[in-house]
Amino acid sequence: YFSNSGVSILYKIPIYQRNYAWGREEIYALIKDVHDSLEKSVYYIGTLVTYKRDENIFEVIDGQQRLTTIYIILKALGIETIANCLTYSARKVSAMTIEKMPKFGEEKDKGIVDGFNYAKEAIKDIVGEKKADIDAFKDFFLNKVHIIHYRVPKDVDLNHYFEVMNSRGEQLEKHEIVKAKLSEQLIGDEDAMEKFSRIWEACSDMSFYIQQKLPEMTTVFGKTMEDFVIESFDEFPSSN
């Protein structure tokens, strides 16, 4: 899915999905499970559910944590032929972190950076440091590890489908469902989606006043920072 084969395919993780959240335990477990399966002819790593938004653009509906982890592991293995075909909708820092990996800038998604470091540690601890062992693991991961890709039909009601997916496994919190329903109304409008994402992220961080989280604070809250000077969502400034 990530090989640089000349086919320009992009997997986009939509705004309603959680940030990347796999920790040391999950990443170690996955790498160990794959390593324990080296003698098998194939290893199925899970299921990916997507919705085709454009000719070669797939919106990830389910499986984004696992898909992102696969990408992180490939980068941690130092495989240079991996195409940059995974990104985040309306999350510039996360998208930039994925794109620049393993060379992270000052602005970075901590969850993704931590995941990369955990993957590096796990590879060293489980696979070892011998070139032959690492090469064997790389070859298996690239050629024998498979993910089942299910593409949702075009006529499917995504709101309903998302609710069904959420009824199994680890359920979303109520505020995450609200976020999904609101963002669904903005699909197709990248500028509006980006605005919504920044507003939501600023409001969801309860450790700061919202004025401290928005660079456009004087435009939105006035010079005293105590007013609300815009009258509609359309007036909220774009980041561009």
Describe the predicted segments one by one.
Residues 1-240:
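Covalent nucleotidyltransferase
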